């Protein structure tokens, strides 16, 4: 059965309930008062200072695997439902970690009847014969922990049937707050008689698996994760959520709420994580050619400069290190680009946050799901920019990739604008830095560096790739129309904007997060059991 057709049919009634004139949730600031109050009798909870605030985190590592049996106490069967971006990685990581910990817990995959993903699941060791692969509702009925990792749009279409199929006392596990946002928007909520938790890796699924595999000899590596305990009827939900994160290989976990998570996550991927960086590269590629560069050099000075130099500095030394490493004219060029780009980028980013917080962006995803049978997801790397990029990558010399100061100014300005919108909305530093910095430089940009923008975007979720395609052109347009023309017309550098960047407290938070980064750098070209997508 064609998934696009099936999803479109399932969403018909869901979209009607979630029509544009439906009551939307009020845009609200995220309260920090509900966070940083968790405790654990199993894992060590650390207090970390992020800029002017203190937050609680749990640091992961393979040395914690012996604690997993206690964290998963009472869980005998886990059902991982779906096989999209996150499910293949999380299912394999959980299976491997629980086995290493000596847990007698069965991890099963649940899929739609007739799904083409059955074969992909078999290829990595799940099977009907071993009772680790089956039809989704059969698996849901058996599971003590239901990890609902089907697409957000499918969750919105099927949530009633899924809740009804869950056995009494089972825990619902999510990796995104989207379903909460959807239910909130239509005046509904999760059933009161179940635990509802979330563990949300701050990176695409393939990177969750790749870093787990590559970090086996360094006490584990993976992708940082947020966790949320939305309902705790059993009194064990926090320990289970933390155990889930440790089993995934998360270097550290920080607390959030489902509401804060979906606002920051949906917003972030439309911004610097995916949509904005796509728009930045396209606009700079054209600009540099207008200035006389060859197509190949224009790609080097735009995309390659971001993924091969700028993001690597940010990953290990922080955002400000990019600026501090420049001298003389290069630093002045950075200031011009940063000053001109900050407010135009922030204008779009504030619009995105408002659209997400109001429920409008959730409606976009739901409605796109309804249209997908008629209008399948298309390629985004057919433009001259990305075609030239294939040639550049084939001839690449990593040691000679430039750090273009203008490119750096535009990219860093957009990243900082994204950070400021989240901070102004009340999100904690741990969430802000992970959704604006760490995920970009440690999970996503390495994929664009390896194979281009489509390889990065299309290995993310349906929600992410929908939003990236929608908002990338907006960044492309506003930077071209407002930022670059301001520079070309000789508009003076706004020293207040530069001063705010130089003294921003987020630099302290990023510095602290750099200490908690994965123990290895991701290698995208090495062998892996992860599922990765290329749209032909």
Task: Locate each region found by the language model.
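NAD(P)-binding Rossmann-fold cofactor-contacting core
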Residues: 47, 95-126
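Glycine-rich adenosine-cofactor-binding loop
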Residues: 75-94, 396, 415
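Rossmann-fold dinucleotide-binding core
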Residues: 174-270, 328-329, 358, 370-400
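N-terminal chloroplast transit peptides
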Residues: 2-25
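NAD(P)-dependent Rossmann-like dehydrogenase/reductase catalytic/cofactor-binding core
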Residues: 35-62, 221, 282, 290-536
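Rossmann-like NAD(P)-binding element
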Residues: 112-113, 122-181, 189-207, 213-215, ...
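Glycine/serine-rich phosphate-binding loop and adjoining beta1-alpha1 elements at the start
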Residues: 28-75, 111-112, 229-231, 245-257, ...
């Amino acid at each position: 059965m064609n998934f696009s057709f099936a999803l479109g049919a399932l969403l018909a009634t869901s979209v009607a309930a979630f029509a544009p004139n439906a009551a939307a949730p009020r845009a609200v600031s995220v309260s920090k008062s509900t966070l940083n109050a968790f405790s654990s009798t199993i894992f060590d909870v650390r207090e970390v200072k992020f800029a002017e605030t203190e937050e609680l985190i749990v640091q992961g590592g393979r040395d914690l695997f012996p604690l997993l049996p206690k964290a998963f106490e009472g869980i005998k069967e886990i059902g991982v439902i779906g096989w999209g971006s996150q499910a293949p990685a999380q299912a394999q990581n959980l299976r491997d970690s629980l086995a290493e910990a000596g847990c007698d817990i069965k991890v099963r995959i649940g899929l739609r009847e007739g799904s083409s993903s059955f074969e992909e699941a078999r290829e990595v060791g799940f099977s009907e014969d071993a009772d680790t692969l089956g039809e989704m509702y059969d698996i849901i009925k058996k599971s003590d922990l239901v990890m609902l990792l089907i697409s957000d749009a499918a969750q919105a279409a099927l949530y009633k049937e899924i809740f009804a199929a869950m056995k009494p006392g089972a825990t619902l596990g999510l990796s995104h707050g989207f379903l909460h946002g959807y239910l909130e928007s239509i005046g509904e909520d999760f059933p009161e008689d179940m635990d509802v938790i979330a563990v949300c890796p701050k990176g695409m699924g393939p990177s969750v698996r790749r870093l787990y595999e590559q970090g086996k000899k360094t006490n584990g590596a993976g992708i940082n994760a947020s966790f949320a305990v939305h309902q705790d009827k059993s009194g064990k939900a926090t320990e289970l959520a933390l155990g889930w994160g440790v089993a995934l290989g998360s270097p550290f976990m920080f607390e959030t709420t489902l509401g804060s998570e979906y606002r920051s996550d949906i917003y972030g991927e439309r911004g610097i994580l995916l949509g904005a960086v796509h728009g930045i590269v396209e606009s700079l590629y054209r600009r540099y050619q207008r200035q006389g560069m060859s197509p190949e050099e224009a790609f080097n000075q735009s995309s390659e400069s971001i993924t091969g130099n700028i993001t690597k500095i940010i990953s290990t030394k922080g955002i400000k290190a990019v600026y501090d490493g420049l001298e003389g004219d290069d630093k002045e060029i950075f200031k011009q680009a940063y000053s001109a780009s900050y407010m135009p980028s922030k204008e779009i980013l504030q619009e995105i946050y408002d659209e997400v917080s109001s429920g409008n962006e959730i409606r976009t995803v739901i409605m796109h799901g309804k249209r997908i049978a008629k209008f399948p997801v298309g390629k985004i790397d057919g433009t001259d920019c990305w075609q030239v990029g294939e040639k550049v990558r084939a001839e690449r010399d990593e040691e000679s990739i430039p750090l273009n100061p203008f490119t750096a100014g535009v990219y860093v300005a957009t990243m900082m604008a994204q950070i400021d919108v989240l901070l102004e909305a009340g999100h904690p530093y741990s969430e802000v830095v992970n959704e604006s910095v760490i995920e970009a430089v440690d999970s996503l940009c390495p994929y664009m560096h390896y194979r281009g923008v489509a390889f990065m975007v299309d290995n993310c979720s349906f929600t992410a790739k929908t939003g990236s395609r929608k908002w990338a052109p907006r960044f492309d347009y506003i930077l071209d129309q407002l930022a670059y023309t301001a520079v070309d017309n000789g508009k003076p550098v706004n020293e207040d904007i530069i001063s705010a960047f130089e003294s921003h407290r987020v630099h302290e938070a990023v510095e602290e997060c750099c200490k908690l980064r994965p123990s290895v750098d991701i290698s995208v070209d090495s062998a892996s059991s992860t599922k990765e997508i290329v749209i032909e």
